Structure formats: structure tokens, C-alpha cells
Amino acid sequence: MKSGEKDYSVKEAMIFSQRIAQLSKALWKCVEKDWQMWIKPYDLNINEHHILTIAYHLKGASISEIAKFGVMHVSTAFNFSKKLEERGYLVFSKKEDDKRNTYIEITDKGEELLLRLMEEYDPENNSVFNGALALRNFYGKFPENIELIAILRNIYGQDFIDIFEKSLEDIEENFTESDQKLVKK
């Protein structure tokens, strides 16, 4: 292959890109609906819930980290964090050695809310989970999504994937099931 030549065709690239776009849009539609239905009784929106979750798993984070790991603009992360602070779920702070960045930490009230939400999670009301259940029943495990993770690693970086994996490991290590509910150990 000559320098500057690509080892894929434009047609191949278009088909792949469109496949990912269409599948992602369809999947997001289900994820968004399920997520909204889960958190609606607690008067939270998806961004607020995501911020609380990130703050919980990171044990505090800068607004920039929240934006990065929450895949949102910094102003979105700040504005929704401010709303959560007003409701007593987060506290803002500055560090002595870093006055430039604003940091947030989940409060006891915020943690209680998040833990209650985790306890209230019902897989029966999750269409993506139910859609994948047939694969689990056939193969004995849920899809691991390694190709999707590899794509996202190339787009967002290894630290994005590390935080993603850490949050899942946190749930694995620090929560248990009791009466078909997820509770903190």
C-alpha cells in the first residue's frame, strides 16, 4: 500500500458509520426511555442522575471530570450540578492548591437518594436488559461489548474506559442482592 492510501473503501466506511449511527440511535431511544422511567419518581433527569453516579463512584470530582466522564459539555455539568447542590445532593468546593477548578462531592442526602434508586432498579422494566436476556440464556452470559468498548477507548481515551470499568467494579464489590434488590454491603 502506498503512503497516503487508505486500506478501506469509502463505501465500507459509509456502511459501517451508518450501521453504528442507526444502531446507536435505536439503542439510545430505549436506554433513554428506560432511564427516565427509572429516575422519574425521584424528580431527577438523566444528566442529574449521571452526575450523582459519577460523583459517587469517583468519591468527588472536578466539574471537568464530570463533563468528560458524563459525556456532556462543561456548562451542562456545572448547571446540573448547581441544581443538585440547591437540592442538597452535592456540595461544591475549591482546593487550596487548585483554585481554578470547581470540585463536587456527593452529600449523605445525595448518596441516600442514589442508593435508594439502585435498590429500586427493576430489570423487568429495562427493555435493553430484556432484549439481551435471550443472548444470556443462549450463551450463559451477557454480551461484553468489547468491540464497542474498543471504539469508545479510541474516541474518549483509556481514562474514560477506566472510570467506566471502576464504576462497574464498585457495584460488583460494594453491593449485594437481598430480596431481589441491590443494596450496599
Swiss-Prot record:
Residues 13-157 form the HTH marR-type domain. The keyword Transcription applies. The keyword Membrane does not apply. GO terms for biological process: negative regulation of DNA-templated transcription; response to stress; sporulation resulting in formation of a cellular spore. Keywords: DNA-binding, Repressor, Sporulation, Transcription, Transcription regulation. Gene3D superfamilies: Winged helix-like DNA-binding domain superfamily/Winged helix DNA-binding domain. GO terms for molecular function: DNA binding; DNA-binding transcription factor activity. It holds the Pfam family MarR. Residues 63-86 bind DNA. Negative regulator of protease production and sporulation. Homodimer. This is HTH-type transcriptional regulator Hpr. It comes from Bacillus anthracis. The lineage of its organism: Bacteria, Bacillati, Bacillota, Bacilli, Bacillales. The gene is hpr.
